[in-house]
Amino acid sequence: MRILVTNDDGIHAPGLDACARIAAALSDDVWVVAPETDQSGVAHSLSLNDPLRLRKVAAQRYAVKGTPTDCVIMAVRHVLIDNPPDLILSGVNRGQNIAEDVSYSGTVAGAIEGTILGIPSIALSQAFGPQTRDNPSYQTAETHGPDVIRTLLAEGIPAGVLINVNFPDRTPDQVAGIAVTAQGRRDQKLMRIDPRKDGRGNDYFWIAFERRSADTVPGSDLRALDEGRISVTPLRVEQTDEPMMTRLAQVFEAR
């Protein structure tokens, strides 16, 4: 099995090395194609106005001046064009990718692009808390990741579906199990703009997030991480809302 590893934190991110080790526990044919620089929050963006630059870092390891989506396309359509990967692992992200994070995440986008290209794809993210944010450990992801992935591959990932896996901020032996979850939703009032001034008195701004309340919906990815469980969420690339499509068809046909 040939595995492609990518991420959004960049070619030098510790989480990328952790993901490569997870892949190495599953196969001896592992390739890494990741962004040259940190691409966190770029979502599923594609570089159309700037050329892509490809740099060979080491054997079977490349850096791309571009987004995670660019990296997957570069890998599948150029680097590995004669023998495409059988599996794409995107991560391990520094921080959780749950709820609305999924829409912004370059890590999840790497898996989305792989799914669009017809390759089974899994996004992997490691949550951290106030005590671990400065130096997050990927040991929980490394310990439990291979078994989770083997189980997913044994079951089979349908076409058009990607898997979003989040590991809790727990040591490997403290993980409370695995939960198959739905994508959660945060209180959007927690998002705010933090205004500041630079040394010359000019305004600048940060997008900031207040700490959310402890109330989460049972069965959601948010609740799973709160309970110290690994969250496994199947996501669809196809975003059509079929019930609404049916309703609108009836509305417009009746005009």
From Swiss-Prot:
The keyword Nucleus does not apply. Its EC number is 3.1.3.5. HAMAP family: SurE. Binds 1 divalent metal cation per subunit. The keyword 4Fe-4S does not apply. Belongs to the SurE nucleotidase family. Nucleotidase that shows phosphatase activity on nucleoside 5'-monophosphates. This is 5'-nucleotidase SurE. A divalent metal cation binds at D8, D9, S40, N93. It is found in: Cytoplasm. Gene3D superfamilies: Survival protein SurE-like phosphatase/nucleotidase. It catalyses: a ribonucleoside 5'-phosphate + H2O = a ribonucleoside + phosphate. GO terms for molecular function: 3'-nucleotidase activity; 5'-nucleotidase activity; exopolyphosphatase activity; metal ion binding; nucleotide binding. One of its GO terms (cellular component) is cytoplasm. It comes from the Bacteria. Keywords: Cytoplasm, Hydrolase, Metal-binding, Nucleotide-binding. Its main location: cytoplasm. Its cofactor is a divalent metal cation.
